[in-house]
Amino acid sequence: MSDGVKHINSAQEFANLLNTTQYVVADFYADWCGPCKAIAPMYAQFAKTFSIPNFLAFAKINVDSVQQVAQHYRVSAMPTFLFFKNGKQVAVNGSVMIQGADVNSLRAAAEKMGRLAKEKAAAAGSS
């Protein structure tokens, strides 16, 4: 996508992203969720700013159309942001998830993931 966000349409598509990208930020949202709509432009901006192919991706997962993934990660409130490293859920800045449209926490997490991914990409000889 031109905004840098990868829209996930199936559990297999999400599994593939986790297997091919070192760091992933996942936004679990619903079309009917007001706070999800409110934070979406900021999430897209973070994706545009920090995404690095194969090193950091920003995914959006609709909890109504990809229920299997939402249930697997026990997402019960929207939006919920989860963080992954090498396919496994990890904590960023002390939290394994951010629930709600908390722009400051999301910005801090995106910046940290961006720094980590940039370091890995540089070490791998990618820019």
Swiss-Prot record:
Organism: Neurospora crassa (strain ATCC 24698 / 74-OR23-1A / CBS 708.71 / DSM 1257 / FGSC 987)
Record bears the keyword Transport: yes
Alphabetically ordered keywords of this record: Disulfide bond, Electron transport, Redox-active center, Transport
Thioredoxin domain location: 2-115
InterPro entries associated with the record: Thioredoxin-like_sf, Thioredoxin_CS, Thioredoxin_domain
Marked site (Contributes to redox potential value) residue numbers: 34-35
Name of this chain's protein: Thioredoxin
Positions annotated as active site in the UniProt record: 33 (nucleophile), 36 (nucleophile)
